[in-house]
Structures are given as structure tokens and as C-alpha cells.
Regions:
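Sec-dependent N-terminal signal peptides
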Residues: 4-13
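Sec/Tat signal peptide C-region and signal peptidase I cleavage site
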Residues: 14-18
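N-terminus-centered regions that define maturation/targeting leaders and the start
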Residues: 19-191
Length: 191
């Protein structure tokens, strides 16, 4: 009789264990996120940041990033217009390329100075207009809006490149070192 009771108790206990639901999986951490207070992702880029700026000089928008993974040594930002290559036979237009932004940074201010090397060690390369720094958007109207893509790369290294680096040079140097990527897109054509 003792054997039967003990077996029944053990089986009841095992059944309770078998019916205990598994712990839920941990929530996935959101990926690297790039934002700006200047416009919503996918929204219209204000003239201030374009070749249609009232002052005649476009300024770069403030950019902020969150959800940075561990192990980031530096960041790179590439701003380009892929619609140019889709609509014509020319390559996409590079509007801005800045790299070796310190891994501790979480934003760039509005109006980054147009100089090759910034005080924090960041390096700005030549844009499509063959000038250092940010070049505002200039898609002509009438016509469809162009989509301007800001790509933020979190890297596990600094790039051994100077301001004469091309977009191809930067992409090659980043190969195998990209920890995370965030994207922000805006639309524009001249009024």
C-alpha cells in the first residue's frame, strides 16, 4: 500500500512539473535607432536642410541614436539619394559622409561645421559636390519626391582613412566591422 501511495504522490508531482508553463523568452532589444527632431522617418525634409534653404546654405539636421549595442568603438553616417540612380543612368548622389564619430557619442548637433576633421576626431569626406561636409538635398520640381537615406553604422573599430576617402573606401573599410545599423529616411523636392 505504501508503494502505491508513494507512486501516486510522485506521479502527481511530476504532472505538476510537466504542466508548469515555461518562462517567456526575454524581450528582444530593439535595434540601433536613428532619429531627428527635424522630421519624422519617411517625412518631408524642411527647406532649412536642403539647397532650397532661405539662407542659401543648407545645414545638417540634429541626429540622435539610441539602442547602441556593446562593443561600439566608432560610428559612421552616410547620407545619399538612391533615387538618382534609379531614375537616371548616373550613380546615387552622396550628400554627406562622416566617420570615426566616437563610440560614446549619441548625437550630432544641427549644423555640423564643414571641416574635414572635427575636434572629437570625426572625419568628414567629400560629398558629390566635391566639398567637405554636408550637402543639402536638391531634387528638382516638378517631379517625384526623392528619398534621402541617412545610414548610421555602429563599428567595432575606427577607420584608418582620411577626408579623401570615397564611399567605396569607407564601405570596404567597414566590411566585417559593422556591429549594428540604423536607417532614417526623408523625402524632398524643390518647391
Amino acid at each position: 500500500m505504501k508503494k502505491i501511495v508513494l507512486t501516486a504522490v510522485l506521479m502527481t508531482g511530476m504532472g505538476a512539473v510537466a504542466q508548469t508553463p515555461a518562462a517567456p523568452p526575454p524581450m528582444a532589444k530593439p535595434g540601433l535607432t536613428l532619429t531627428t527632431p527635424a522630421f519624422d522617418d519617411g517625412g518631408i525634409i524642411p527647406n532649412k536642410y536642403t539647397q532650397a534653404a532661405e539662407t542659401g546654405v543648407a545645414v545638417s539636421p540634429k541626429l540622435t541614436w539610441t539602442n547602441v549595442p556593446d562593443g561600439v568603438v566608432s560610428f559612421a553616417i552616410i547620407l545619399h539619394d538612391p533615387d538618382t540612380s534609379l531614375n537616371k543612368t548616373t550613380s546615387e548622389v552622396l550628400h554627406w559622409m562622416i566617420f570615426n564619430i566616437p563610440g560614446t557619442a549619441r548625437e550630432l548637433p544641427e549644423g555640423v561645421p564643414t571641416q574635414a576633421q572635427l575636434p572629437d576626431g570625426s572625419i568628414q569626406a567629400l560629398n558629390r559636390g566635391q566639398k567637405v561636409g554636408y550637402m543639402g538635398m536638391g531634387a528638382r520640381a516638378p517631379g517625384p519626391y526623392h528619398h534621402y537615406t541617412y545610414e548610421l553604422y555602429a563599428l567595432d573599430t575606427k577607420l584608418s582613412l582620411g577626408p579623401d576617402a570615397t564611399q567605396a573606401d569607407v564601405m570596404k573599410a567597414m566590411d566585417g566591422h559593422i556591429v549594428a545599423k540604423g536607417v532614417l529616411e526623408g523625402r524632398f523636392h524643390r518647391p
